[in-house]
Amino acid sequence: MSSTTSLPVAREGGQLQWLWKRDLTHYPVGGYRVFLLAVVVLANIVFTWTVAAGAAATPVIFPHFGMTLGYYANLLVVAGVVGGLASYISSWGDRWGRANMVVIGLLINGLFALFAIPLAPNKFAFALLTCLLYLADGAIFVGTPALVRDFSPQMQRGLAMGFWTFGPVAGYFVLSAVARAYLPLNVTFANWQNLYRFSGYAALVMFVVCLVFLRELPAGIRSQRMAALNERVLVEVKARGLDLAEATKHRWRQMIHVNTIASSIAINLFLVIYFTAVAYFVFYLPLFLHFSLSSFNGIQEIYWGVNIVALVVWGALSDWLRVRKPFMVLGSAGTIVAIILLMNAKAGVSFTAMALILSLLSTSLACCYAPWFASFTETLEARNPALIATGSSLYGFATRVVGVPFGLIIPHIVGSPVETASGWRTWYWICIGTVVVFVPFIFTMYGHWRPSTARKEFEEHEAKVAEELSRLRQESAAA
């Protein structure tokens, strides 16, 4: 139909309206599609960096503000609830679009990280401002995966969702790298504040990039399933007759099912060990295993770096084989093995040994998560491709729902002080249990177990697409 090599953006109604009217006129192809995906991924990285900026030096903030582990855990719980509310609001992205949510969220996070949080006078102000950061993050947590789904057909979805997960993963990788390079061995609150400022500068730069360049598909195009890029002409033709109001009617009734709600909760149960690594390894490794803060950030760099590579590799493999579920099972098994190794690590364990254990954990989490997210978006499309943001908000809300109870109970299980060996051992057994609970829900997801079955279904679908495209060409020639 058309090759989208320039910025194919509808700009009717004024020279500046393109800053908020972001609909493309055609499905993007080639380098421009890759560029749009890259912008979304970079935005997601910066979002994670701003929200987690202080995590690399959390032990310093506790004495500065007079916070306890219990207060910190409760803060994460409240912030998670706030993010969950934002997820619900952003579910309207099916009608309003997703791109402006990302742009506005970057501006909010940039201003708060650069100015507000570093100047927080007390722990209450710090907690309030952190919750506001999570409010913006909750909206973006829905908007960015929806955009990645929009720009990636199903045959490239595993790789695309692996790249989307770069946001949470690469955000922490950047944070660890900056912290290890910038923070001295004796960390003070003054240099800790700059971790937020660095992320704030990055967020404002990314805000300008997204304001100028980020675009999205019009509702008619994004509300359809597309298995491969060669279907884009057919999708654009069908979009002309699509009734969006009818397609999005009774949206919650359409999207709330076992394989959307229960699987969203189940994957977050699987990720309890991931949430533990994000929020509490900063205590566990330095205080229990006696690593310095610098060594901890070095191990974290390796952990997140391995995760980045693994997400792309596992996502690409699941695309190539056209199956997701076997990877989820393999990743679950590897995660259990890694937790057992971590549980049996003792004080004095070497840097290399701990890096290897966490690399196994990181690889296993990626093996399950990237294919799961690809399968989840395909499951949503099987329900109604016009309600991807609504379905994504279920996942975003489930992330917070699972985080609330676990955030409340972990301080009581690991004990205070944090160096309680029996408490951490109990917690790791709970993490193993949550992985086991996840496994049965793999069977509820959309998709096949055997590559041969998936390949046959795709070939049949391609034959139907070719037939429809041939009919369209004949009708066009006759006209």
Model feature map: region roles:
Residues 382-418:
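A late C-terminal transmembrane helix in Major Facilitator Superfamily
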Residues 129-167:
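Cytoplasmic helix-loop-helix junction between adjacent transmembrane helices
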Residues 76-91, 301-314:
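Central cavity-lining transmembrane alpha-helices of secondary-active solute carriers
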Residues 95-106, 319-333:
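Cytoplasmic membrane-interface "Motif A"-like loop-to-helix N-cap segments
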Residues 164-219:
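Helix-loop-helix hairpin linking two adjacent transmembrane segments in secondary transporters
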